[in-house]
Amino acid sequence: MALIAQKPKGTQDVRPEEVYKWHTVEKLAAETAECYGFKEIRFPTFENTKLFKRSVGDTTDVVQKEMYSVTAKSSANGKDADDFALRPEGTAGAARAVIENGLLNEALPQKVYYLISCFRHEKPQAGRLREFHQFGAEMYGSALPSADADMIAMVKTFIERLGIKDIVLNINSIGCPKCRAEYHKALKAYFESRKEELCGTCRERLEKNPMRILDCKSPICQDIAKDAPVILDYLCDDCSGHFEKLKKHLDAMNIEYTVNPKIVRGLDYYTKTVFEFVSTHIGAQGTICGGGRYDGLIEQLGGNPTPALGFA
C-alpha cells in the first residue's frame, strides 16, 4: 500500500534512538543559560504577521520571500480576518512577550532564553531546513558594552561544552540610525556604479536597503562588495566608543575575535554590535550562531525605550 503522505519538504523526523542527542544539546543549553542568570520563556509558534513586518523588516528576504503566512477568518462572512505567520525567528516573539507580560516593569536587566522551532520557506539544503530549531537568549535593560561581551562569553561557553572545535568569532558594529544614514548614501553610490553586475535580488536591495547586498551569497556580488565602503569608517562617536569598549572587554576575557566589517546580519532590527560564531569545517553554511544588539526594537513594538541584545 502506498504511503498516503510524506513529511513536508525541508523538515525532518527524529528516530527514537536519535532523540537522546537532542536532549543532550537542550540540557546543555538550559544549564549554560541558567548559569549566566537567564530564565526560560515560552511564547506562541505563530504571531500576528505585522509583528514580524515591524521588527524583522518589511524589505528583508525573511518577510518578503520566506515567511509562512495564513489568514484566519474570524467570522462566517469572512470579514475581520486576522493575518498570522509561523515564527521565522525568536527575537520578535520574545520581545512581544516580555512587553505584554510586564517583565520590563520589573528589575532590569531581564534575561530570558528559549528552545524553539522556527519556519522559513527557503530552498532546503545542507544546514538549512524549512523547519529548524534554535537555542536563543535575550537581555533587556542594559546598554553596556560589557553586556555584549557577557552574551558572547555565554555562547562561547555553550559551544565549548558541546565539544565543537575550530570556531571563529567575528564581530562588527553596524552603528545606529544616525550614522547608518550616511553609510547608506556611500554604499548606494558605490553599488550604483556597478549595478548591472549585481544579481537581480541585489539590484532590488540597492533601492530598498543597500546593506543587504553585503549579506549576499552570490560569488559575483561578494567580489563586488570587497571594495565597498566600510561601516566602521562612518560610526558616530557613541557607536565607535561602544565598539572599542566591547573589544577591550573581550580582550580582558581572553576571547579571541576577528573584526569583520562585512557582517550585517539579515534582519533590520540590529544596531551597534553584531557577531557570528562560524565553523571552519562546515563550508558555506558555517555560521552556527549569530546575534547582536537591537536597542530600538522594544520601543518600535510599543514598549518603553529599552536597550536589548540577543543571539540564536
Where does each model-flagged region fall?
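TRNA-recognition modules of translation machinery and tRNA-sensing kinases, especially anticodon-binding
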Residues: 1-312
